[in-house]
């Protein structure tokens, strides 16, 4: 049975962003193992990158029948898959049995286009996601141990063979800043791997990037 549109507007959406290796998947596993009975729909770019903890499946904490795991293929969620994202979110919302939607962006995704998807009316597809759900949180996971190395590298994504295609001229530093600036929650991960001086300077840097964010520190290898 489908919920009416009034009910469907209550479906909150969280987008998880962060550069490759920052800890997005570990955070996702943590959310799934602490969902407090909520039914969560997960949308990802590449299911092979997500690697949902097998223990969650064995313990019944996650299953493809109880929750929805949707894979978007052949591109970066921020650039080439907006149409796919629109269709999948609408489909999940209309099914009426989802409490929360979590979108894990690709490590090379910029958050802004993903966020715009939830305020964008696609007249060609006839989809208006504001009728079904609301974007509540933009989370960016930052690898505190590698951030400054990546930021100061001067490399392009293509230099690391991480570009979407051969024409992807994006700079890694610019991508990192985009992911930080367009978020309202920053999770500073692997904080245990850096010294106190670096820790304080990193925290000050992220806090000064914008005045809107909640900044949390964590060591995702242990407990968030």
Where are these regions (language model features)?
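C-terminal accessory "lid"/substrate-recognition subdomains
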Residues: 2-5, 161-224
């Amino acid at each position: 049975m489908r919920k009416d549109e009034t009910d469907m507007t209550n479906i909150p959406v969280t987008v998880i962003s962060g550069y490759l290796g920052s800890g997005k998947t570990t955070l996702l596993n943590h959310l799934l193992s602490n969902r407090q009975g909520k039914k969560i729909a997960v949308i990802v770019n590449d299911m092979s990158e997500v690697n949902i903890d097998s223990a969650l499946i064995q313990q019944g904490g996650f299953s493809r029948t109880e929750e929805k795991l949707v894979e978007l293929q052949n591109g970066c969620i921020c650039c080439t898959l907006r149409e796919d994202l629109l269709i999948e979110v609408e489909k999940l919302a209309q099914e009426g049995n989802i409490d929360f939607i979590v979108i894990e962006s690709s490590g090379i995704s910029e958050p802004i286009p993903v966020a715009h998807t939830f305020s964008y009316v696609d007249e060609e597809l006839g989809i208006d996601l504001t009728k079904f759900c609301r974007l509540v949180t933009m989370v960016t996971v930052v690898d505190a141990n590698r951030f400054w190395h990546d930021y100061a590298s001067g490399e392009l994504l293509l230099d690391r063979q991480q570009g979407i295609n051969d024409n992807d001229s994006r700079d890694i530093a610019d991508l990192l800043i985009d992911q930080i600036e367009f978020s309202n929650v920053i999770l500073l991960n692997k904080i245990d791997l850096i010294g106190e001086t670096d820790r304080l300077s990193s925290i000050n840097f992220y806090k000064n990037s914008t005045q809107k964010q909640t900044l949390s520190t964590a060591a995702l290898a242990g407990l968030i």
